[in-house]
From Swiss-Prot:
UniProt-annotated location(s): Cytoplasm
Oligomer status and interactors: Monomer. Binds 30S ribosomal subunits, but not 50S ribosomal subunits or 70S ribosomes.
Cellular component per GO, a single term: cytosol
A GO molecular function held by the record: ribosomal small subunit binding
Described purpose of this protein according to its UniProt entry: One of several proteins that assist in the late maturation steps of the functional core of the 30S ribosomal subunit. Associates with free 30S ribosomal subunits (but not with 30S subunits that are part of 70S ribosomes or polysomes). Required for efficient processing of 16S rRNA. May interact with the 5'-terminal helix region of 16S rRNA.
GO process terms (BP): maturation of SSU-rRNA
Name of the molecule in the record: Ribosome-binding factor A
């Protein structure tokens, strides 16, 4: 009996997961940009949504956020968690899915990691190692 073709594994999930995640990302970014969440903490911050990851069954969306300037991240996450029910309802209205995904918020730490690597690359020891050899022996 022939084996069924196994789809190639994608690092971020299937094409459908990636497509739905991007749609959810656009929806949540629009909601936050338009100031539709009436929370004093969120009204004082611009929040970026660089990534959303969907579970395989599309029932859970992990939304990575970063307040502009990188300050008060814990307060922003708490405010988003307090407004989770409203945000989930808004996502359900904007994204055409059988089930509205449950949502959870996480701080996107990629910016901090990139800054740490950039700082490391600028250290004198690394600069010395990266400099071209001028020794012609």
């Amino acid at each position: 009996m022939p084996r069924r073709h196994q789809p190639e594994k994608h690092p971020g999930g299937s094409h459908r997961q990636l497509r739905v995640a991007e749609t959810v990302r656009h929806a949540i970014a629009d909601i936050l940009a338009q100031g539709q969440v009436h929370d004093p903490v969120l009204e004082g911050h611009l929040v970026t949504v660089p990534e959303v990851r969907m579970s395989a069954d599309l029932k859970l969306a992990t939304i990575y956020v970063m307040p502009l300037g990188g300050r008060d991240t814990a307060d922003v996450i708490d405010a988003l968690d307090r407004n989770r029910k409203f945000l989930r309802g808004e996502i359900a209205r904007r994204v055409n899915l059988k089930f509205a995904p449950d949502i959870r918020f996480r701080v996107d730490e990629r910016f901090d990691e990139a800054e740490r690597i950039e700082k490391l690359l600028r250290t004198p020891a690394v600069q010395r190692d990266l400099a071209p050899d001028t020794d012609e022996s």
